[in-house]
Amino acid sequence: MAQVLTQFDTIAAISTPIGEGGISIVRLSGEDAVAIANKLFKGADLTKVPTHTIHYGHIVDPKTKEVVDETMVSVLRAPKTFTREDMVEINCHGGMIVTNDILQLLLANGARMADPGEFTKRAFMNGRIDLTQAESVMDIVRAKTDKSRQVAMTQLAGGLLDKIKTMRQELLDTMAHEEVNIDYPEYDMDDLTSQEMKKKAQEVSKQIEQLLQTAQEGKIIRNGLATAIVGRPNVGKSSLLNYLTQDDKAIVTDIAGTTRDTLEEYVSVKGVPLKLIDTAGIHHTEDKVEKIGVERSKKAIKEADLVLLLLDASQDLTAEDKRLLDLTANKKRIIILNKQDLGTKISQEMIKDITDNPIIVTSILKQKNMDALENAIEKLFFSGIENSQNQILVTNQRQAGLLTKAKQSLEDVISGIDDAMPLDLVQIDLKNAWDTLGEITGESAPDELITQLFSQFCLGK
């Protein structure tokens, strides 16, 4: 359970991406953060400046007296900081050498190198955020679309936390009521309190079910929709990838078989991230390199959430086209009849006789009817998703798994009462549900889970 801890040492890390840029930020957090930074800083005395102020000066090696860089240094004092500890942020010029030199000086003067995610972990351990909010910090960093960011911001603001806390309080109130009955059986309130317990278990179970119904939507918004672009060679797959990405990542030529591997790219369709995979054409080949590409394409199709299957509308349906139609028959897919400007030998009616999947007729190179493709994707997966950034969504497998576990405990409460089990035994399942919900927010999460979760963060976060 999150609690305020004061015995942490002082940590330091580079918080910005390593490389050349306008500025880099080196971050400190801990009881000695200001004192350590002050050893290196020539300008104002950082130990005497007000909190939440920024100061111009130079970082100087205290041993050699060499000026390392010209900097702006922010001083942020506990408890109104991200970690609820004293923090210092050194804004230096954005270069690998100068940034690392400043970090090494901080480490040589009393700071410790931060573990991945340790700043956010301290924010959690000091009670500033819960685990769902900590996860949302990582989601904001990794957001691939505006919608991903908006959903993560809702989580960071405490949307899911508030919902979980409300459900836990309802269960806690019920448990307290039942404890009175168990401890004072002479009042003979079994029938009344058991029915109240059942009703509350049903109510909270329904709330959990409503959250679980958002899990698929939340997963897609957070992780993206794995989308395989499939078709025989030279049918327009790379042209579709280039149109959607507005980029030349995939090589487009008139020679069949030029995409010899799977190429991945993220794009935003109606605000939802699609992880596009441009696959090699699936066809018989003796070329060893192409064979590898074909096998990877089959694997990509198997793992895809959505298949965009391209057919050349200007040519008759080939044996390879038919194989691809069979290979993707059990996938969610959209059929794209491309090159319709060159003539129509494959019509919508012909494909409708084979499948009831959505069909888009287009010329990708001439960008005809491409908005229909985005609309078809939205309709297939995301109907009603437009306002989801304001919804409370379950966005990862950990949350969904724990909600499912809590719901099962509540179902056990209901069945136990129906079977007239003793209240003290039913109470165990009720407490299990309460504890499991607490794991979601971190209030009753084991240390191993907390350590594993924060290890997924980047350094400096």
Swiss-Prot record:
The TrmE-type G domain sits at 224-382
Annotated coiled-coil positions are none
What positions does the entry give for K(+) binding? 234, 253, 255, 258
The alphabetized UniProt keywords are: Cytoplasm, GTP-binding, Hydrolase, Magnesium, Metal-binding, Nucleotide-binding, Potassium, tRNA processing
Q: Which SUPFAM superfamilies does UniProt cross-reference here?
A: P-loop containing nucleoside triphosphate hydrolases
Keyword field contains GTP-binding: yes
* Record keyword Magnesium present: yes
Residue positions annotated to bind Mg(2+) are: 238, 259
Q: Binding positions for (6S)-5-formyl-5,6,7,8-tetrahydrofolate?
A: 27, 89, 128, 461
Q: Name one GO molecular function term.
A: metal ion binding
Q: Which cofactor does it need?
A: K(+)
**Residues that, per the record, bind GTP:** 234-239, 253-259, 278-281
- A GO BP entry: tRNA wobble uridine modification
Cofactor binding comment, as recorded: Binds 1 potassium ion per subunit.
Q: Check the record and name the InterPro entries matching this protein.
A: G_TrmE, GTP-bd, GTP-bd_TrmE_N, GTPase_MnmE, MnmE_dom2, MnmE_helical, P-loop_NTPase, Small_GTP-bd
This protein's assembly is summarised as: Homodimer. Heterotetramer of two MnmE and two MnmG subunits.
> Which NCBIfam families does this one have?
mnmE_trmE_thdF, PRK05291.1-3, small_GTP
Function statement = Exhibits a very high intrinsic GTPase hydrolysis rate. Involved in the addition of a carboxymethylaminomethyl (cmnm) group at the wobble position (U34) of certain tRNAs, forming tRNA-cmnm(5)s(2)U34.
Q: Which family does it belong to?
A: Belongs to the TRAFAC class TrmE-Era-EngA-EngB-Septin-like GTPase superfamily. TrmE GTPase family.
Name the UniProt record assigns to this protein: tRNA modification GTPase MnmE
Instruction: Report the source organism.
Output: Lactobacillus gasseri (strain ATCC 33323 / DSM 20243 / BCRC 14619 / CIP 102991 / JCM 1131 / KCTC 3163 / NCIMB 11718 / NCTC 13722 / AM63)
